[in-house]
Amino acid sequence: MKKIKSFGGKSLGGGKQEKILKDFARMQEELQKKIQELEESFSQIEVEASVGGGAVRIVATCDRRVKDIEIDEDLKEDFDTLKDLLIAGMNEVMEKIEKRREEEMSKITQQFGIPGLM
């Protein structure tokens, strides 16, 4: 990197700027690696939502995959209620997934001094 001279003839950069840029690039690589590892771990983190007093229970992973749905036998005959509870349960589990993803991402960004990245 070429040093730039100011009006007084003093150097305005060079060594310090290069070090800062190299440190920033290294930190960016580390952050990207940690985020990639976190994304891969989301398939192992489960979130659960239960609605209708436990009549419908949905288990999903943080990579947004539904893993299991349990439905109370009493709902077998009441399609409209079942449908409403499934919608409510899916919405709740998705909200929980997003919250958990944000919490996990926050742990990483705080390590790098980057608050509120997600």
From Swiss-Prot:
Work out whether the entry's keyword set contains DNA-binding: yes
Which Pfam families does its entry note?
YbaB_DNA_bd
Q: Which SUPFAM superfamilies match?
A: YbaB-like
Cell wall biogenesis/degradation in keyword set: no
- GO CC field: bacterial nucleoid; cytosol
Keyword list, A-Z:
Cytoplasm, DNA-binding
State where the protein is found.
Cytoplasm, Nucleoid
Q: Tell me, what is one Gene Ontology molecular-function annotation carried by this entry?
A: DNA binding
| Subunit record text | Homodimer.
NCBIfam families in alphabetical order: DNA_YbaB_EbfC
The UniProt function text for this chain reads: Binds to DNA and alters its conformation. May be involved in regulation of gene expression, nucleoid organization and DNA protection.
UniProt similarity note: Belongs to the YbaB/EbfC family.
Designated name of the protein: Nucleoid-associated protein TM_0687
